[in-house]
Amino acid sequence: MNTFLIIDGMNLVRRMHAAQPNENDVNGLDIRVGSACKKLVKYHQPTHVAVVWDGDDISWRKHLFEDYKKGRKPMPEALSNTLPALKSYLAEQGVNSIDAASEADDVIATLASKLVANGGKAIIVSTDKGFTQLSDPYIQRWDHFNQHYMTIEEREEKLGVEHSQFIDYLALAGDSGNKIPGVPGIGPKSAIELLRTFRSLANIYASLDKIGAKQAKKLEAGKQMARLSYKLVQLQTDIPLNINLSQFRLPNPNA
């Protein structure tokens, strides 16, 4: 079975860089990132490995909702400037890159989903909670910084909803980190209670007559925001990749 180690490049690099006291200090970053990738390969023993990077194009999510990820601190210029050299260094170490047009998340989700559909296995190295929605047991998530697999049970316990309700939950409660609006007036606690009672976003909106008048009014007024938020949260798993897996095969996975 092909096992593809898919590394979320900016998730890894920005967190490693954030540990530096001076954001303009990128000395040795290539060696540290290269060492991290080498450890990941040694531990997981994949047949293929790639680092997927965000691109410069405006995300389709930003076109859909202008406030998407609004207010996020921009990447330090020194870090941005060193990325080409970092990618070259990783390639010299046998770890090739995939450059997304905009957000890497959809490329990662598509690659993982297509691998599994063709009998493979994917290990996504990222702490991004958005990958929680990828439910196939042959798609695993690895937290490099805490050195453990992030399980469905762990995420369910943290959110208070079932794995299958993850997107519905964020469509209702929103996500402040990504500026996903959710339904105004429906916070995490209310979203959990609604999903425990009605099981899904569709069922909630089909049962407004069974919900208290005040809450039903909020839900009705925020229906379009719920739909928008659902679209923003949902990962695309069918975008064109135009890659050849042989580019990312490791010559000796046991090395």
Swiss-Prot record:
Presence of keyword Repeat: no
Cofactor stoichiometry and binding remark: Binds 2 Mg(2+) per subunit. Only one magnesium ion has a direct interaction with the protein, the other interactions are indirect.
Enzyme Commission number(s) from the entry: 3.1.-.-
UniProt binding sites for K(+): L172, A173, P181, V183, I186
Segments of this protein annotated with the region Interaction with DNA: 185-190
MF (Gene Ontology): 5'-3' exonuclease activity; 5'-flap endonuclease activity; DNA binding; magnesium ion binding; potassium ion binding
Residue span, 5'-3' exonuclease domain: 162-253
Family stated for the protein in its record: Belongs to the Xni family.
Protein name: Flap endonuclease Xni
Organism: Shewanella sediminis (strain HAW-EB3)
Lineage of the organism: Bacteria, Pseudomonadati, Pseudomonadota, Gammaproteobacteria, Alteromonadales
